[in-house]
């Protein structure tokens, strides 16, 4: 009789213990492995990467400033140096950001200047050339005492409009970011500059 009672007590305790374990499992779930910490990404790694300048060397040998034209694709953020319908070179750009969109349509190169400087955007610098305030507009910002305006460098500049919009070397973050100009890589801007002339047609739009 005592053995039977002891057996019943053990069975009861086992049932209670099993129910308790199951309840805890349902409440907290199985132990999950901790996720592996991910290394912090540099800010530069978050910038959209653009394919570099591509050049068709065989077509480049045929290119002259008399037979080339330029096509700029705003959606693709690419500029094309072309002979007829054939692409001689294809390079990354950064066009005008929202509110400062690059003017679209059929244009021509109005001026070539290998060492152009902006008359509107640049920095305020002191007498020693030290930048006191960067990224200013000569139109809307006041120069601190003892400083003067130094226009931003726009190397290998190709003027497209009378009010100063053109193609030139600039920072390429992978999206439209300029004040209206069409920025190019150093190698792209130099190549385009070398193979066009004043009067070369330039088409800017949704190509």
Pin down the residues of each PLM region.
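N-terminal pre-domains immediately preceding structured catalytic cores
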Residues: 2-207
């Amino acid at each position: 009789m005592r053995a039977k009672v002891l057996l019943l007590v053990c069975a009861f305790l086992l049932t209670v213990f099993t129910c308790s374990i199951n309840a805890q499992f349902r409440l907290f779930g199985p132990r999950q492995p901790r996720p592996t910490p991910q290394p912090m990404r540099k800010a530069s790694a978050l910038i959209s990467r653009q394919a570099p300048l591509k050049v068709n060397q065989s077509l480049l040998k045929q290119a002259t400033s008399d037979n080339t034209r330029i096509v700029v694709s705003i959606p693709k953020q690419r500029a094309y140096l072309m002979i007829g319908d054939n692409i001689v070179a294809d390079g990354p750009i950064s066009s005008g950001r929202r509110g400062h969109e690059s003017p679209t349509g059929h244009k021509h190169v109005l001026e070539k200047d290998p060492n152009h400087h902006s008359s509107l955007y640049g920095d305020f610098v002191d007498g020693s050339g030290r930048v006191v305030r960067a990224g200013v507009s000569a139109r809307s910002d006041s120069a601190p005492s003892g400083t003067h305006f130094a226009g931003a460098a726009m190397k290998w500049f190709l003027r497209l409009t009378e009010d100063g919009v053109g193609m030139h070397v600039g920072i390429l973050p992978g999206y439209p970011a300029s004040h209206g100009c069409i920025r190019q890589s150093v190698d792209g801007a130099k190549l385009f500059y070398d193979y066009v002339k004043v009067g070369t047609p330039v088409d800017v739009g949704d190509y």
